[in-house]
Amino acid sequence: MAPSLASGPADRIIVALDGMAPEQALRFAAQLDGLRWVKVGLELFVQAGPEVVAQLREQGLRVFLDLKFHDIPATMAGACRRAAALGAELITVHACAGSEALKAAQAAAVEGAQQAGLNPPTLLAVTVLTSWEEQRLQRELAIQQSIGERVPALAQLSATAGIGGCVCSPLEAAALRAQHPEPFALVTPGIRPKGSAVGDQARVMGPAEAIAAGASQLVIGRPITKADDPSAAFAACCTQLLGSID
């Protein structure tokens, strides 16, 4: 089951603590007014270790652990079991790992959370990274499907395997939501509020538009973390969501 979402805009925004040292990430998260969710990615996790999840939870925050596990079924199961026991509420796995690995990961995540006395997390299958463009997928990976074909296929594979949601570009959110009603979670990076630079994201959308398209939650990093006034930038993102949430 997906983590419950309150009605407020702040519950829909996950701030990515990317590019920060551990102490900086903890301080930033503690000082951002109204923050509910944070994303811990590979760089921060490798530098800080698993304890960063506990430290953020001690600050009253909910954690999206974005490590994108992609391995054989037994290894993915072991990793998800331990990630769930840390208290992460959202955990990413690669859909390309295949149905056996996804099923093993899902079962292990439930087991790990139960053993730790926690509610089971939602696993999110990564479909196509938002940095990829269609021509590059064809040229570098010899994938002949269009992104519009590949993303729904991977999402369906994941849903059939029991995964509770997926990570997708906001540009694919409407099509996926039509196929997968809530509570299937759609978490979308590639969110760029009005006036923000696109950066290394190839498939982007504004916050209100992404929610209207069917996204459950939005991952926003640099437009907030690199802003002159991060709290004001976060508040502005929340304001942009007003009217987009039922």
Swiss-Prot record:
It is an enzyme of class 4 (lyase). It catalyses: orotidine 5'-phosphate + H(+) = UMP + CO2. Its EC number is 4.1.1.23. SUPFAM superfamilies: Ribulose-phoshate binding barrel. CDD domains: OMP_decarboxylase_like. Pathway: Pyrimidine metabolism; UMP biosynthesis via de novo pathway; UMP from orotate: step 2/2. Keywords: Decarboxylase, Lyase, Pyrimidine biosynthesis. Coiled coil: none annotated. The active site is at K68. One of its GO terms (cellular component) is cytosol. It comes from the Bacteria. SMART domains: OMPdecase. Disulfide bonds: none annotated. GO terms for molecular function: orotidine-5'-phosphate decarboxylase activity. InterPro entries: Aldolase_TIM (IPR013785), OMPdecase (IPR014732), OMPdecase_AS (IPR018089), OMPdecase_bac (IPR047596), OMPdeCOase_dom (IPR001754), RibuloseP-bd_barrel (IPR011060). Belongs to the OMP decarboxylase family. Type 1 subfamily. Homodimer. NCBIfam families: PRK00230.1 (NF001273), pyrF (TIGR01740). This is Orotidine 5'-phosphate decarboxylase. It comes from Parasynechococcus marenigrum (strain WH8102).
